[in-house]
Amino acid sequence: MNHRIEDITSNPSSPSPNSPFSSPQVSLQPSIIQNGLNSNNSLLNGNNFNLNGNITSSPSTSSSPPISTTTTTTTTTTTTATAKKTNSKEKKKTTNKDNNNNNNNNNSNNQQQQQQQQQQQQQQQQQQQYEEEDDDEEDEGGDDNTKVGKGEKMKARRTNQNIASRNYRQRKKVYIKEMEDKINSLTLENDSLKKDLYKIGNNPLELLKFSQEVVFLMTQIRRLVFQIDQALRNSEPDSSIKSLLNTWQSTMDQASSINEREIERFVHPYTQAKLTVMGYKPHTNPWTDFIKTPGQEDWWTKYAEKANLSSDQLEQINNLWLRFDEEERVLQKELTDLDEYIKKFFLTKIIIMPDTEKLNDIISSCLPIPENHDGDILQTSEVLEFIYNLEKLKQKFIKVQRLTWDTSKQMSKYLTVRQEAFLLVLVHSNTKYIHTNMDMTNNLWNQLNHSALSKTPSTYLLGGVHSSSSSSSSSSSSMSSSTSRILNNHGIPTPLSSSNSSPSSLSASSSIGESIHSYSQLPNVVQPIQTQPSSMFTPLPGAKPLKNQQPIDDLFFGTIPLSQVPLSFQQNSNMALFSNYRNFTQQQAQQQQQQQQQQHAQQHAQQQAQQQAHLQAQIQAQIMQQAQQIHQVQQAQQASQQAAQQAAQQAAAQQAAQQQAAQQQSPIQTQLSPPQHITPQHTPQQHIQQQQQHQNYQGTEPHLLGEFMFFNSIDATNSNNNNNNNNNNNNNNNNNNNNNNNNNNNNNNNSTPIDQLNEYRPDYNNNNTNKILPNIIQSLSASSNNSLFSHQHQQQNSQSPTLPPSQNDSVQFHFYQPIHQNNQNNQNHNN
């Protein structure tokens, strides 16, 4: 502010000390201006002017120090500022008045006026900004104390705002969390309700079933008892028996906890009300009915003798049981008292039933029956007392159960491991839960009462369904007589008259179930017989015969198996009841027969499977034997082939030696013999060349292997024959010529090409070579009559078979004959 003051003092236009503004009259001007501002306060507020700075600056001038050079300058600045503001305000007033006049006079020039107003508003905003800047500058020239106070106030305000916002956020988080928890709990409840509704929709009796945990624990307990029995019989050590007893105790603890949860369902008010209406009375504890005083029970004395219980053990167990008996009596008495109280509450407060006192009051008073159905409203104290008694009943049930289990645990302290195991097996030998029988009973119940009630209209009754088949029947007084008459009309014996008849005999009648309205299932809703209401003391009229009654067979035989069809029904009953227990025994016998048939069928199937397996094993054994025989035959053939080859080699060697000897003995005869009569004999070199040719053919045609082997053997035999004939020629020239001719023929036959044998060659894939080979060997061995080779061959191969004499000269024929002839020769040889 000092530089501003200097500017004002240095400005020539600023008033001098001798000017009229510096006179004492100047002190009156701010008050006058302030009064004018207060008078026009509403107008300034309408135009959004802020006069806080001017108003607050007035006390600062009044509270300023004594007048000096600086004070005069400040007063002059304030006066100039106020003068400017008054001028601007007067201008604004005039402009507003002009605008109002123009708006009233010139309605047609609204757009121009709006533009002018916008321009004026912009000018006014600019003026306001300038004025606010001036006011801020003037405020900055205030005292430092005011700045510090404002800063502290702003800090305090900010801190308060931060704290408030923080608290709000925290409250918001807590609220959101609470709402999420509520939503989660509602969703869980909704899911549980959906599951319950689904169960009730499928089968309303599912909630009354034993849970899967109970069934599992019962079967587990039964299995443990069996294991303990086996351990005792096998005389296992005490450690293993002790481990089994520990597992049994843990499973019993789980079963007791599950039973405590089941008690809550039975103590429910609705369940107790149903039991009260049905007239149910509680009985004693079934877990302790088999023993009351151990000293008086025969089985206990026998157990003590077999288990070798001492006198101390017997005394302690008897004392323990007496204490248990006393406590159980007290609990049973309390349970009966609570049961009587609960029944009385239900029968007097909720389900009002008649008693002698009420009947006497009604007879004595002769008052009319009140129209209202509701009785007196109960007080909260009575309801609370009833709930307390229900909770007390629950606790008593739990206490009885725990007392029994704790007593059994205490008894184990006085017994050894084997004695306890023996007692456990003895008591629980017959304690079991046959859940399969329970499921079968439940399924039959549901089938007769719920599952079949789906498609038939509700107007038809279970005991008397309207049908046209019994319209001609006479009147009767009961439903049982009408049903028996229907059965007799259709040729079916009644249950009372034919106790020995089985349900299968009922299916023999083919005319059963023929009616106009044939229904495949039971009616959906069972309704009572509609009769007119009668007065209390007037006798009821006789029962009229039902018209159009449908046969019972149409209702049951189409949907329920014959083993489960009831044969008679009571009047107006919602469920089917057997009239005679013999029918039920017959059904059981039929079920047993069916089970036996199934078992026989299973046994027969098992026997067939065993027979098939045995046959397969036999077939496999035969196949293995045949394979071994074939292998042996092949080995024998290979051995015979090898022996033939060896014999051929030996014969060739002998022939060579004989030729050399013959050449040395008669060189002149060999030289004089004519060349045209020399028979082409197979020398060893020619034999080797022929084998090479056969091998070449064998490379091109693998299936001719057997034929080449046969050629080799034939060549060897022919060469032996030639050698023998040559030896005879040395002695007889005439015979030599004939033998040479025979040798020529044999050589010509041996030189037959392979192409001529293709028509008669054996099939290699059918293994006919194995059949032809022995025939050729036999024919070769038989063809040499009185020759040296045949004699030597018979000596070397004495085990080789020989053919009959009629086949001695049939070597070539056997070799070139077709396959079927070879097979015939094989058959003849085998014979």
UniProtKB/Swiss-Prot annotation:
**SMART domains documented for this protein:** BRLZ
Taxonomically, which superkingdom?
Eukaryota
Keyword Transcription regulation: yes or no? yes
| Keywords carried by this UniProt record | Coiled coil, DNA-binding, Nucleus, Transcription, Transcription regulation
Name the segments for region: Disordered: 1-33, 54-166, 469-510, 658-697, 715-771, 787-810
Query: Where is region (Basic motif) located?
Result: 153-173
Which CDD domains does the annotation name?
A: bZIP
Q: Where in the cell is it found?
A: Nucleus
One of the GO biological process terms: regulation of gene expression
Q: Does the keyword Nucleus apply?
A: yes
Outline the segment boundaries, as ranges, of region: Leucine-zipper: 176-183
Residue spans of biased composition, Low complexity class: 54-85, 97-129, 469-484, 497-510, 674-695, 720-750, 787-800
Question: Which Pfam family is an annotated match for this chain, by its short name?
Answer: bZIP_2
Q: Biased-composition ranges for Acidic residues?
A: 130-143
Q: Which family is it part of? A: Belongs to the bZIP family.
The job of this chain, per UniProt, is described as:
Probable transcriptional regulator.
Kindly provide the name given to this protein in its UniProt entry.
Probable basic-leucine zipper transcription factor P
Q: Which classification does the entry list for the species?
A: Eukaryota, Amoebozoa, Evosea, Eumycetozoa, Dictyostelia
